[in-house]
């Protein structure tokens, strides 16, 4: 029993075909807007009529819908096939050693890898300009994870229990892409890359990234009532600037199991009562590779010749995004039937990793930088009730509610606010992220039919100006969210239903742009508001 080892490997192969224009027929919901204007029967065949125009049946399949301006997806699949295949492997191995009592040494290795191929053809007889094209693209990806830990459990007496763990983990990821296109092919029977009279510049890209971590934890419990957990880790990522690749994080947590105290032993209706508090820091490295480096890229043409040009600005100060979190909670169960869990939290996020806008005179639109700080405060409450419990039957209900108050606390370059172009959003210190920033519409003037708006000072105007945009008091992210559910059980058979909800979230109704717009009256049904 002192040595254990294992291996698990999964291998899969997937092959499928798609059209190049997979959404040529557009969204399935569009038929609700255009059914009466286009073809109510939704057929894809020619409609046959007699001399008086009466329907007599269906003829051959239509390859192009004149009234809609779309090609038949079946037709596209025949003339522009897209063949894709993926080979994927997931595997892991481990070795577990127990040299002495309480000591567990474990090493594990895992791999996630795939090889993807896409073969696209556009036969010369196709109706599209530039037909007679073949392209091949490949992608190879693999990620290796190496984890090594040593855990030691011991006690100083029956009341003092310790668990000490030290570990190291490395994640190595590599990705490579290649694609090439050949044009001006004349025979659909010879759609090989070498058969084209003209070739595009091949595209070849690759990236490597490495994540290393050293960590340790100490867990202590006293008298099976008081618990303390300490954790520390040092993380390093190749995604950041050379002098900022490493960062330290830590956490501290404590829990008091009050139900086991002597002064509560005789409280029969109280099943459990626990108080807990924790504080810790974590890091985020969720950016793409090489943003910290000033790079040049290829795939560009100048005067018909291949060339290179700057592709990323680089940032010598790019570092980890960090989050500090405080949690305070209480949980209890009473009468062996009712359970309640309440938790308050405060999360402060600093050095947020975001795209920082640059003047186009620099030759770049943006650069990834540590640009802002944000705070989230709120609470979570979970309730549960066992309505009925018998030997064969059980019925329970549960629900949860979350409230989160979000606030931007800092922006880049000392700015107090920044408008995100073409998004209807504005970042402002003291405001939540995601509050809409628009010019308020005041309706249509019935005297002349013109739109009216509110300017920044709340006055009516018929002159629309982006300068009159204001915060409208509505958010794209819900401050309230939750859910509820119920579960029935009978002799080992269970049935459950779960529901979720959000309150205070607003979304743009883009459908109204088409269904309440005279410009689209010829192609989309209009709502009664347009009468």
Language-model regions, residue ranges each:
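Transmembrane beta-barrel architecture of outer membranes
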Residues: 213, 247-251
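Conserved C-terminal beta-signal and adjacent last beta-strands/turns
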Residues: 396, 475-503
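Short glycine/threonine-rich loop-to-helix capping motif typified by GTGT followed
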Residues: 242-246
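Transmembrane beta-strand segments that form the barrel wall of outer-membrane beta-barrel proteins
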Residues: 228-237, 386
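Short, contiguous hydrophobic alpha-helices characteristic of membrane insertion segments
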Residues: 216-232
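Residues on the lipid-exposed face of transmembrane beta-strands in outer-membrane beta-barrel proteins
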Residues: 1, 91-97, 148-152, 166, ...
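Surface-exposed loop/interface segments of Gram-negative outer-membrane beta-barrel transport/assembly proteins
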Residues: 2-88, 106-212, 239-241, 258-325, ...
């Amino acid at each position: 029993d002192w040595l254990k080892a294992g291996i698990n490997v999964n291998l899969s192969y997937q092959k499928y075909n798609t059209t190049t224009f997979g959404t040529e027929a557009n969204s399935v919901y569009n038929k609700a807007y255009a059914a009466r204007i286009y073809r109510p029967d939704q057929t894809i065949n020619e409609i046959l009529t007699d001399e008086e125009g009466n329907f007599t049946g269906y003829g051959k399949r239509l390859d192009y819908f004149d009234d809609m301006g779309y090609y038949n997806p079946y037709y596209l699949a025949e003339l522009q096939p897209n063949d894709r295949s993926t080979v994927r492997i997931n595997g892991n191995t481990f070795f577990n050693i127990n040299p002495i009592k309480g000591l567990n040494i474990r090493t594990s290795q895992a791999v996630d890898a795939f090889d993807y191929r896409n073969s696209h053809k556009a036969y010369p007889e196709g109706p599209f300009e530039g037909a007679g094209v073949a392209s091949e693209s490949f992608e190879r990806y693999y990620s290796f994870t190496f984890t090594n830990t040593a855990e030691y459990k011991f006690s100083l007496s029956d009341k003092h229990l310790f668990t000490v763990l030290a570990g190291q983990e490395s994640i190595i990821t590599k990705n490579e892409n290649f694609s090439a296109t050949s044009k001006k092919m004349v025979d659909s029977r010879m759609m090989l890359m070498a058969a084209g009279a003209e070739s595009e510049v091949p595209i070849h890209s690759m990236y490597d990234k490495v994540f290393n971590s050293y960590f340790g934890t100490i867990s202590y419990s006293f008298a099976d009532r008081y618990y303390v957990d300490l954790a520390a880790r040092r993380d390093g990522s190749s995604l950041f600037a050379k002098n900022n690749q490493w960062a330290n994080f830590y956490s501290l947590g404590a829990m008091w199991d009050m139900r086991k105290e002597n002064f509560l032993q005789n409280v029969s209706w109280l099943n459990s009562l626990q108080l807990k508090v924790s504080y810790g820091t974590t890091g985020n490295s969720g950016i793409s590779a090489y943003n910290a480096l000033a790079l040049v890229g290829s795939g560009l043409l100048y005067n018909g010749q291949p060339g290179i040009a700057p592709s990323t600005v680089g940032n010598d100060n790019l570092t980890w995004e960090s989050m500090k979190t405080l949690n305070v909670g209480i949980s209890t169960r009473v009468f062996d039937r009712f359970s309640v869990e309440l938790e308050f939290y405060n999360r402060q996020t600093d050095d947020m990793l975001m795209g920082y806008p640059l003047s186009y005179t620099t030759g770049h639109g943006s650069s990834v930088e540590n640009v802002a700080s944000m705070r989230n405060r709120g609470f979570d409450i979970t309730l549960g009730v066992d309505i009925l419990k018998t030997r064969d039957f059980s019925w329970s209900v549960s629900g949860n509610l979350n409230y989160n108050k979000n606030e931007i606390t800092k922006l880049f370059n000392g700015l107090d606010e920044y408008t995100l172009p073409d998004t209807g959003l504005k970042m402002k210190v003291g405001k939540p992220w995601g509050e809409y920033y628009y010019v308020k519409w005041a309706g249509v003037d019935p005297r002349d039919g013109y739109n009216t708006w509110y300017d920044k000072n709340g006055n009516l105007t018929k002159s629309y100006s982006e300068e009159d945009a204001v915060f409208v008091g509505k958010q794209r992210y819900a401050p309230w969210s939750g859910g509820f559910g119920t579960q029935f059980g009978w002799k080992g058979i269970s049935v459950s239903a779960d529901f979720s909800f959000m309150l205070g979230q607003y979304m743009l109704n883009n459908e109204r742009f088409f269904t309440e717009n005279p410009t689209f009256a010829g192609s989309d049904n209009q709502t009664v508001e347009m009468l």
